[in-house]
Amino acid sequence: MTREEIIEAIKGMSVLELNELVKACEEEFGVSAAAPVAVAGAAGAAGAAAGEEKTEFDVVLAEAGAKKLQVIKVVRELTGLGLKDAKALVDGAPKTIKEGVAKEEAESMKAKIEEAGGKVELK
């Protein structure tokens, strides 16, 4: 397989499939695809009393924004909730979407929801 063929295959994948691919690559090669800590670490280091980086986060939907329908769709995808439950969660913002989530997954969830138009906080 050529590099171009691999790139074309990746272009055709959904965000969920890409996330699974990254995790599989991390496990297979013993590496981490985490972004450099310099950017995110500066904000996190200020709040850390003992200097340790937080490993588990609560993903909180702060507000749905103008594209509420898109946010509901993303919340359904991320949580596996039904339409009624996802709508109730989004309508009741601020609400916790998931608790005790690994940093990479929390950041991925935040990016997906913000891309859909919502505002998210990681606590």
Swiss-Prot record:
InterPro entries: Ribosomal_bL12 (IPR000206), Ribosomal_bL12_C (IPR013823), Ribosomal_bL12_C/ClpS-like (IPR014719), Ribosomal_bL12_oligo (IPR008932), Ribosomal_bL12_oligo_N_sf (IPR036235). The keyword Lyase does not apply. GO terms for biological process: translation. GO terms for cellular component: cytosolic large ribosomal subunit. Keywords: Ribonucleoprotein, Ribosomal protein. GO terms for molecular function: mRNA binding; structural constituent of ribosome. It comes from the Bacteria. Coiled coil: none annotated. The keyword Translocase does not apply. Belongs to the bacterial ribosomal protein bL12 family. Forms part of the ribosomal stalk which helps the ribosome interact with GTP-bound translation factors. Is thus essential for accurate translation. Homodimer. Part of the ribosomal stalk of the 50S ribosomal subunit. Forms a multimeric L10(L12)X complex, where L10 forms an elongated spine to which 2 to 4 L12 dimers bind in a sequential fashion. Binds GTP-bound translation factors. HAMAP family: Ribosomal_bL12 (MF_00368). PANTHER family: 39S RIBOSOMAL PROTEIN L12 (PTHR45987), LARGE RIBOSOMAL SUBUNIT PROTEIN BL12M (PTHR45987:SF4). This is Large ribosomal subunit protein bL12. The lineage of its organism: Bacteria, Bacillati, Bacillota, Clostridia, Eubacteriales. The gene is rplL.
